Amino acid sequence: MGIGIIIASHGKFAEGIHQSGSMIFGDQEKVQVVTFMPSEGPDDLYAHFNNAIAQFDVDDEILVLADLWSGSPFNQASRIARENPDRKIAIITGLNLPMLIQAYTERMMDANATVEQVAANIIKEAKGGIKALP
């Protein structure tokens, strides 16, 4: 058992942030990218999520890092979570690079952590990654 990570976004943002995360942290196992393209509809996105989840082990918990609360990627991830109550799925929105790096770090540092524990730590760190230089 482990934690599979799905990076999800409108357009190719998820692909780009996945590439950036790999440049900083190296290639990671159990990471899938889900993109929602302009030519696609909600059912296409739903299928993309199911295909991503199928790449993980059946006992893996799942962490979804989505770009926008109430956006289509979030809505379809929420739908899948509701339809699979026996599967632990946590969804975090506001996707940014510090969030992804922290997800990788949390997963590496504590292999026994639950997806809920990992999500709570990610949120704290991701918020701290938003700064301004006067």
Task: Kindly give the residue locations of the regions a language model identified.
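N-terminal loops that bind phosphate or other acidic moieties
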Residues: G2-P134
